[in-house]
UniProtKB/Swiss-Prot annotation:
One of its GO terms (molecular function) is glutaconate CoA-transferase activity. It catalyses: trans-glutaconate + acetyl-CoA = (2E)-glutaconyl-CoA + acetate. This is Glutaconate CoA-transferase subunit B. Pathway: Amino-acid degradation; L-glutamate degradation via hydroxyglutarate pathway; crotonoyl-CoA from L-glutamate: step 3/5. InterPro entries: CoA_trans_fam_I, NagB/RpiA_transferase-like. It comes from Acidaminococcus fermentans (strain ATCC 25085 / DSM 20731 / CCUG 9996 / CIP 106432 / VR4). The gene is gctB. Its main location: cytoplasm. SUPFAM superfamilies: NagB/RpiA/CoA transferase-like (SSF100950). Catalyzes the transfer of the CoA moiety from acetyl-CoA to (R)-2-hydroxyglutarate and related compounds like glutaconate. One of its GO terms (cellular component) is cytoplasm. Belongs to the 3-oxoacid CoA-transferase subunit B family. GO terms for biological process: glutamate catabolic process via 2-hydroxyglutarate. Heterooctamer of four A and four B subunits.
Amino acid sequence: MADYTNYTNKEMQAVTIAKQIKNGQVVTVGTGLPLIGASVAKRVYAPDCHIIVESGLMDCSPVEVPRSVGDLRFMAHCGCIWPNVRFVGFEINEYLHKANRLIAFIGGAQIDPYGNVNSTSIGDYHHPKTRFTGSGGANGIATYSNTIIMMQHEKRRFMNKIDYVTSPGWIDGPGGRERLGLPGDVGPQLVVTDKGILKFDEKTKRMYLAAYYPTSSPEDVLENTGFDLDVSKAVELEAPDPAVIKLIREEIDPGQAFIQVPTEAK
């Protein structure tokens, strides 16, 4: 018999994402964990949120998680397919930035204490050890939107100084965005990792640990962070509702495209 109390950290991460989404918000997602989280939000926590996808799909309600942004499973359950897909992200972000309703998900290989994200390269830019796919739409999203950043919590990823700034966060603290001509009233709101939730101090704009998973601890988070991190405000999150874990496994991602279910939990 399936054990829905035996959850994985990725499932916890997806549920944590879902709980950050509110009714009335417009949510920009791609695929993977952010999409699973947004799908859970739409089904459970925020049925009146509106999911949009960078390929031009508006107000999506996927039954089963699509594998890519062009997957037909997206198109079967969406309110509108915008033909001008190349510019949709920037047009929508600019419009919704003014309405302050948009929340968007981005990720990367490295992040610094102010939420600047690198998804371009590791090492010297001109002679990199590793070259990634780059910004895609993430730079435009991070410029004009409030963002939730998805990361694996490892010391090599949480760095005091990242190798390249692909997507701007709070730059170097208060006023940093404005000095570069970026909107100062939007920026990274949360970092959701496989260990917990990190937020940004309103005054300093520096990251701090807000909450940690039952499977983690403040000490565990510190051990896997490459810069000084305030953990004094951190609280332990509740374990996810088994009914939501069942929903993820049986309806949203039954093929385990993005979340692998442990054998003992099947």
